Amino acid sequence: PKPSSAASDVYKRQVMEAAIKACEAVDICVKEVIETALANDYTTIVIADHGNCETMINPDGTPNTAHTTNPVPIILVDKELQFIDNGILGDIAPTILELMGIEKPAAMTQHSLLHPIQK
């Protein structure tokens, strides 16, 4: 059943506050990982396979517990590489293999998202 308007408003606020806290915690952790990577000249990829917190409440007021199909960010930190625009989840494994200097198996049909920085 659909919650009452007042209950729905409280629920939405609590859920959104929890989502914001979770995102802030992730931001702090990612910052630490990236700073460590930069200090040690590591290549780092930060990715996600789905979204959710950007659409936490359905239009009818019920909670959205499903993963969204919205685009998610992919972040590469490296001094000599950058990503091309756009890609799909299937491109991640070939990208990681290229970063590791490992040849992509023929069974992988997707491509790496890397290319050198244009100078």
Predicted region positions:
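Polar, surface-exposed loop/tail segments
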Residues: 102-119
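Structural beta-strand/beta-sheet cores of well-ordered domains, especially the beta-sheet scaffolds
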Residues: 1, 40-43, 70-73
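Short, internal active-site loops enriched in acidic
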Residues: 8, 49-53, 119
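Single conserved hydrophobic/aromatic residue that forms the stacking wall/gate
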Residues: 1-7, 11
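Short active-site-adjacent structural elements
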Residues: 9, 53-56, 82-84
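Metal-dependent active-site segment of extracytoplasmic phospho-/sulfohydrolases and closely related
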Residues: 15-60, 96
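Substrate-binding rim/cap in mid-to-C-terminal beta-strand-loop elements of soluble/periplasmic
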Residues: 61-95, 99-100
